[in-house]
Amino acid sequence: MMTAVSQMSVPSSRILLDVDCRVCEDHSSGKHYSIFSCDGCAGFFKRSIRRHRQYVCKNKGSPSEGQCKVDKTHRNQCRACRLRKCLEIGMNKDAVQHERGPRNSSLRRQQMMFDHGSSPNSPEMGSESDAIILPTSSMNRDTVAGTAARIFFALVGFCQNPLNGVPKERQMTMFQQNWAALLVLHATETRAITSKQIRTETISGSSEQRNAVANAFEIIERLQLDNREYMMLKHFTMWRDTPSAIQIVFQLASIQNFTHRTEPTRYIQCINAIAAIPTTSIIDVLFRPSIGSASMPRLIQDMFKPPQQPTPTSLFPMANFNLNFLLKQEKTETEEGEDIEEEDDATSSNQFDENSSTDDRSVGELDPVQLFLALNSSTQPSSASSPSSSRPRHSIRSITELLSIQEEESVNVEEV
């Protein structure tokens, strides 16, 4: 009888009643792949990664694609969104790939009992992937900060898709103004970061800052918004300073009148709760471990900055040194050719005027493209010249020859 009772109590001893699964909010059974989760979500994640599953959201093609609710009741309805949430909260794919054998291996069980000095019923045994065990405070801090960072980078893509027709500078300004509100909405929608975590886990920021952020999360969590409401609130947040916000307000009012008639301040509570959080508090509480002393506005500016294109000057490292000499050579040849036919003389005069205006500027101020064009036009015969003038305007055929001529002239000047 005693044996039967102990066997029946084995499964319940692994359940942590005070720690929720980060994926579906059911009771967790310990850390799986670096995250507190239940056996169901841990097993789903392991199978998906090992078999390289490619899921498709059940709402594909609709505005709510990729926004399916994942909780204890709905966790089996959309595998794509369940796997996405597992990755968003920080489940480690590498831990799945490097597992050392099957879960029920008796040899592995005995080895772990010997290494950790614990019974097979301890919560640590439920964590099949914790090859590296970090201190609790460090793990929690990294988890919250890492999750916030992943959400932040996901929001950049979320904002850029509907803003394709908006200039980059305007995109950056809109994201600078609204990223904090969007992050709170996305974190509460996916339950990737909760008010309970912010209050209980060891994270950065002062106690006042943590309470302010946790209070806002708590208010939004109590409203229990659905996916459609979250989506519309995100779009309202992003477009609130544009005429498009008016249409979104009408849609929210319609939802409130038909679905939440008894909650006339439902969306006002959400908007006010987000507005009450200083952006500096969100940065200090959720991002300071990730970005250190870096400036968040500067980080956003760098993310929206277009990639720099290589300049043509990199192809001609000696061009800046030789341009002035090349232009002076043009001037000398033009003066020596005063007895050439009138048509040819006019052409040379025009070319001299153009080059002399360029010579008045310093080489460092020239545009790289103009520099490239100047070199090409100076090393080829003029197509406008008369047929009688068959010789090239100068005999320089390469940068190497140009350098040698320049050295000879410098020697002659020194002798004089």
Swiss-Prot record:
Its main location: nucleus. It is found in: Nucleus. Residues 377-390 have a biased composition (Low complexity). InterPro entries: NHR-like_dom_sf, Nuclear_hormone_rcpt_NR2, Znf_hrmn_rcpt, Znf_NHR/GATA. It comes from the Eukaryota. Residues 335-346 have a biased composition (Acidic residues). Residues 18-98 bind DNA. It holds the Pfam family zf-C4. Keywords: DNA-binding, Metal-binding, Nucleus, Receptor, Transcription, Transcription regulation, Zinc, Zinc-finger. PROSITE patterns: NUCLEAR_REC_DBD_1, NUCLEAR_REC_DBD_2. Expressed in linker cell. One of its GO terms (biological process) is gonad morphogenesis. A zinc finger (NR C4-type) spans 21-41, 57-86. Disruption phenotype: RNAi-mediated knockdown in males prevents migration of the linker cell (LC) during larval development resulting in abnormal gonad migration. At the L3-to-L4 molt stage, the LC fails to reach the P7.p hypodermal cell and fails to perform the turn from the dorsal to the ventral side of the body. During the late L4 stage, the LC turns ventrally but stays farther behind its normal position. In addition, LC polarization, which normally occurs during the L3-L4 stages, is severely delayed and mig-2 polarization to the adherent side of thr LC is impaired. Residues 331-398 are annotated as: Disordered. GO terms for molecular function: DNA-binding transcription factor activity; nuclear receptor activity; RNA polymerase II cis-regulatory region sequence-specific DNA binding; RNA polymerase II transcription regulatory region sequence-specific DNA binding; sequence-specific DNA binding; zinc ion binding. Gene3D superfamilies: Erythroid Transcription Factor GATA-1, subunit A, Retinoid X Receptor. Orphan nuclear receptor that binds DNA containing an extended core motif half-site sequence 5'-AAGTCA-3'. In males, plays an essential role in the migration of the linker cell which guides gonad elongation during the L3 and L4 stages of larval development by negatively regulating the expression of netrin receptor unc-5 at the mid-L3 stage. Involved in the regulation of non-apoptotic cell death in the linker cell, acting upstream of or in parallel to transcription factor hsf-1. Belongs to the nuclear hormone receptor family. This is Nuclear hormone receptor family member nhr-67. It comes from Caenorhabditis elegans.
